[in-house]
Amino acid sequence: MTNTIDFKHVEKNARIRDFENEKEKFKQDHNGINQEEVNQAMQVLSKATGGKEIFIGTKRSPQSKVKFAQFIQDNWDYALENAFFTDEEMLFLLRIQRFLQFKSNCIVNDIHSRNALPMSQKQIADRLKTDKSKISRIVNSLVQKGVIVKANGHKPEGVKARTYALFINPNIIYSGERDNVETTLKALFMNSKSLFKKFPIALF
C-alpha cells in the first residue's frame, strides 16, 4: 500500500512551528515579554500621544563611553608559549594599546576625538619617550609577522613623505566588538591569515 503525504498539511504545520519559534525568540530577546504585550503597550502610548507615531529606545549606558582594548588571551598564550614575540615587541604592544581607535584598530593621536589622526612612527616614539629608530625596527618586525599593517595614504603635492596609518591585527588586540570586526580591518589583514593559521582563535 502506497503512503500518501498531504503536502498542504505538512506545509501548514511547518509554518505554525516557524511562527511559534519566532514568538519564542521574540520573548527571549525582550526579557520574557511577548509580541502581543508589546503591541498593547504601543497602542496605549499611541492613544496617550494623540495617535502620533511612537518610537521606543533604550538609554545608553554610561559604560558605553568607556574606551577599551581586548587582548585575545588564547592567542597571546600561544604567542608567548612559542616565543612569537620578542620582549621589546610585547612591551611595545602593551604600551600602544591605549592608542587604538575604537573599531578601526588604528594607532591614533587621540582615542576620544572624532577627528583623531593616525600617528606616525616619529609621533609614537615621542609619546613613548623613545627614539624613532627603535620604533621603526619594532614596527617593521611586527609588519613581517602580520601583527601590524602599514597602510599608505595620499601624498600631498610638494610633500616628500607619503602619509600612512598603522593598524593592529584584531586577532592579537582589538578595540571593538569581537563578533563584529570592521570589514575594512578584515581586508587589511586578509593576507596575514596564513601567518596565524596555528593560532587557536581567528576572529575572521
Curated annotation (Swiss-Prot):
Keyword rRNA-binding in record: no
Pfam families listed in its UniProt record: MarR_2
Highest taxon of the lineage: Bacteria
GO molecular function terms attached to this record: DNA-binding transcription factor activity
UniProt cross-references to InterPro entries, sorted A to Z: HTH_MarR-typ, WH-like_DNA-bd_sf, WH_DNA-bd_sf
Disulphide bridges, residue numbers: none
Keywords: Plasmid
Keyword Repeat found: no
Biological function: Possibly involved in pGI2 replication mechanism.
Protein name (record): Uncharacterized 23.6 kDa protein
Organism (species): Bacillus thuringiensis
